[in-house]
């Protein structure tokens, strides 16, 4: 049984995500202040009073009758399985193939920056094999993913524009994506609908960052093979509705320096 609500920080501002109601909202200042400084609860408030305050504001579910709640959750999961449709695993069908760039074979022994970029993208995001599992299509990649969902993708900045990396074709497609990137940087994003298309729960956020850790570690390892380095930083995105976002939630930016 998974929580249907969770408080998270977006750009330093606390938000409450409600996966059952498909909504998110920013906390009011009083609650936000406590969320950023949790020790304030123990210094200025009675714990029981504080618990009731949080319960009324956030609306946690009452698990007094745990067995009934578990049964209701199971019924809801069955309903979601029946009506949910797996989203497209890549976004290429939304883009024009005009001006697309086929990347070179990865892992060539060369100092060419474009070849290094090809190796980084293939190692961190590229598809090794496509399979069917319980009626769903899944990608097998060089990096693991919780539940084989692989909902993390890459946009690349080159001198002449921004490109979406098609992990299945190992190809770059011109995209109208706007990011504050310098040439050679990789903008790493996750697609909420891929992680939550069956279970719209807070647990997916932990899955995203587990997957991201594998990707960043792999990129760093490949960069070292080419005697170069990877510089990662958090991506600063405007606080938007995580539940209803189509496919862009920036989580990191990578740049390599030959």
From Swiss-Prot:
Example GO molecular function: oxidoreductase activity
Record-linked InterPro entries: Nitroreductase-like
Domain of life: Bacteria
Role this protein plays: The actions of the proteins TfxB, TfxD and TfxF are implicated in the processing of the inactive trifolitoxin (TfxA) precursor into the active peptide.
UniProt protein name: Trifolitoxin-processing protein TfxF
Species in which this protein is naturally found: Rhizobium leguminosarum bv. trifolii
């Amino acid at each position: 049984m998974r929580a249907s609500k969770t408080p998270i920080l977006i750009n330093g501002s606390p938000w409450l995500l409600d996966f059952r109601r498909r909504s998110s909202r920013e906390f009011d200042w009083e609650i936000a202040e406590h969320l950023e400084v949790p020790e304030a609860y123990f210094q200025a408030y009675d714990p029981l009073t504080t618990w009731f305050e949080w319960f009324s504001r956030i609306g946690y579910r009452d698990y007094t009758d745990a067995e009934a709640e578990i049964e209701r959750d199971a019924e809801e999961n069955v309903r979601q399985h029946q009506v949910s449709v797996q989203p497209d695993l890549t976004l290429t069908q939304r883009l024009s193939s005009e001006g697309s760039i086929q990347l070179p074979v990865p892992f060539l022994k060369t100092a060419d920056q474009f070849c290094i970029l090809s190796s980084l993208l293939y190692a961190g995001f590229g598809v090794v094999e496509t399979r069917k599992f319980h009626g769903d299509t899944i990608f097998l990649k060089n990096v693991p993913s919780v539940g084989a969902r692989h909902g993390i993708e890459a946009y690349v900045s080159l001198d002449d524009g921004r490109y979406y990396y098609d992990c299945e074709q190992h190809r770059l497609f011109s995209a109208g994506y706007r990011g504050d990137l310098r040439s050679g940087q990789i903008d790493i994003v996750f697609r909420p609908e891929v992680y939550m298309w069956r279970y719209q729960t807070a647990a997916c956020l932990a899955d995203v960052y587990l997957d991201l850790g594998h990707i960043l570690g792999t990129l760093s390892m490949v960069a070292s093979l080419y005697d170069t380095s990877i510089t990662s930083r958090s991506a600063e995105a405007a606080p938007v509705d995580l539940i209803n976002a189509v496919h862009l939630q920036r989580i990191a930016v990578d740049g390599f320096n030959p």
